[in-house]
Amino acid sequence: MAGRRLNLRWALSVLCVLLMAETVSGTRGSSTGAHISPQFPASGVNQTPVVDCRKVCGLNVSDRCDFIRTNPDCHSDGGYLDYLEGIFCHFPPSLLPLAVTLYVSWLLYLFLILGVTAAKFFCPNLSAISTTLKLSHNVAGVTFLAFGNGAPDIFSALVAFSDPHTAGLALGALFGAGVLVTTVVAGGITILHPFMAASRPFFRDIVFYMVAVFLTFLMLFRGRVTLAWALGYLGLYVFYVVTVILCTWIYQRQRRGSLFCPMPVTPEILSDSEEDRVSSNTNSYDYGDEYRPLFFYQETTAQILVRALNPLDYMKWRRKSAYWKALKVFKLPVEFLLLLTVPVVDPDKDDQNWKRPLNCLHLVISPLVVVLTLQSGTYGVYEIGGLVPVWVVVVIAGTALASVTFFATSDSQPPRLHWLFAFLGFLTSALWINAAATEVVNILRSLGVVFRLSNTVLGLTLLAWGNSIGDAFSDFTLARQGYPRMAFSACFGGIIFNILVGVGLGCLLQISRSHTEVKLEPDGLLVWVLAGALGLSLVFSLVSVPLQCFQLSRVYGFCLLLFYLNFLVVALLTEFGVIHLKSM
């Protein structure tokens, strides 16, 4: 069952990519005017067409609000809240620490939203779609599961790349996550459980990742990304997928006839802590088993709805630790909202998680969420013929469809087209993730303005840590459970997808919208320090692992951790100008 669930959640990465293209391009394109205030120069401010927004803190307190509202560099295209205006126009200077504290708290909660949505709603629906499409393990493994696990990273990169002001944030996050995963996570795995690495998958993944990093280094050196380069990134990932499939096919042929049965999914093709995702999906939102009553009786429609919307397992609550309970309290509002708006299909259950009253309610609420989150709600409030908003039409159509479905189905038997709810759930959860990722990017940029930090350093620290912490714990759990090779392989498989698809698709969306090449303006020396550190960490592993005869010890793990600490110190010293070059 675990093997099946492991490979179920990956379908529709291509469809999701198309969704991302529409979602992100729309998010940036439609709301440009929404955040631009009247175009009058601020009193007492020497206004220029574009001034670095980080200079706002050097102005008089009375001029800061006007500067934020009139300076194009301070406008965040997309998102629902204007965080910079909130700090400088609605909080007095004496309450700036309070504003920053609230923003950081909201940022942490957004990371929680990203994790819950991806793990418990987005990935399970990908699993159901993969089962419906009958995809092979290999194809699903290196594409759709990688996308499902890396959804927060990919969405954050797409949102950041779609705005020239935050492109550095995307590069910092992708490079920063790469350094973090290949040093801290990989090192932690070997410290927890020394093991013998698989030579061929190791060489394959690290070489592909080094090529991706080198291409990104060249892209930064050129300072621009053309359509050919963007397509080249995506093409390289396709080539990687083909290589993995061929390597796995050759590996299985060599093992054919052996006394040992091959694994359904070999460690060679695992990506980004899959096994933990399986465990997560198996244990989370198993609605039927969690809330199954001791005595079977015919439940009413209201009882089915209440049980389906209950995100809390009371038996599990009683036996869990205080830490788990505290975290669950914060998750409950998010889980309830997602249960209400996102359908989840589970092919492994007899009823496929069919809950008639809730699923019929989804036919009304989910499309409404789609139109209100797509392009930051621009589509939803658009008035057809200047009379009726789109969201009203969606509610009417959804209500009619829900009524037909409710009276044409039963509580005990899922309908023949129930699998279509997986596509609806996938679309809705993807848009929830995109909305949260947009807010994350906007908050980080606002904090960068307040503290005069570059987008790159915010990306390599806060954004990289926030998006990678879940996978880090997942891989550490795998290592403790005796699967260090699987976890180590996941370190490289997932980040290859993130950098190639994140950069390639993000730049492709920007090019398709603006019809010009993407201009990149590296944040000084720091970007080169980041790229160099990632390259050095890969070279270190490429040289040291074969020298150890692929027997990875705790010494190797501690060396990787020491490397990351040194990198972090150098990066921060570079950001604050302690380390600098005269030519920079």
Curated annotation (Swiss-Prot):
Modified residues annotated as Phosphoserine in this record: 258
Any GO BP annotation: regulation of cytosolic calcium ion concentration
Listed result of changing residue 149 to A: Lithium-selective; displays reduced calcium:sodium antiporter activity while retaining almost normal calcium:lithium antiporter activity
Stated consequence of mutating residue 471 to A: Sodium-selective; has little effect on calcium:sodium antiporter activity while displaying markedly reduced calcium:lithium antiporter activity
InterPro entries according to UniProt: CaCA_antiporter (IPR051359), NaCa_Exmemb (IPR004837), NCX_ion-bd_dom_sf (IPR044880)
Pfam families: Na_Ca_ex
Activity regulation behaviour: Inhibited by the sodium/calcium exchanger inhibitor CGP-37157. Strongly inhibited by zinc.
Outcome of mutating residue 258 to A: Abolished ability to prevent calcium overload
Cytoplasmic side: 117-140, 190-200, 248-325, 382-383, 438-445, 509-524, 580-584
Topology class, membrane: Multi-pass membrane protein
Alphabetic keyword roster: Antiport, Calcium, Calcium transport, Glycoprotein, Ion transport, Lithium, Membrane, Mitochondrion, Mitochondrion inner membrane, Phosphoprotein, Sensory transduction, Signal, Sodium, Sodium transport, Transmembrane, Transmembrane helix, Transport
Consequence of substituting residue 471 to E: Non-selective; displays reduction of both calcium:sodium and calcium:lithium antiporter activities
List of glycosylated residues: 60
Result when mutating residue 152 to A: Lithium-selective; displays markedly reduced calcium:sodium antiporter activity while retaining almost normal calcium:lithium antiporter activity
Consequence when changing residue 153 to A: Lithium-selective; displays markedly reduced calcium:sodium antiporter activity while retaining almost normal calcium:lithium antiporter activity
Intracellular or extracellular location(s): Mitochondrion inner membrane
Recorded superkingdom: Eukaryota
Effect in UniProt of substituting residue 258 to D: Phosphomimetic mutant; prevents calcium overload
Tissue distribution: Present in pancreatic beta-cells (at protein level).
Function recorded in the entry: Mitochondrial sodium/calcium antiporter that mediates sodium-dependent calcium efflux from mitochondrion, by mediating the exchange of 3 sodium ions per 1 calcium ion. Plays a central role in mitochondrial calcium homeostasis by mediating mitochondrial calcium extrusion: calcium efflux is essential for mitochondrial function and cell survival, notably in cardiomyocytes.
Protein name according to UniProt: Mitochondrial sodium/calcium exchanger protein
Species whose genome carries this gene: Homo sapiens (Human)
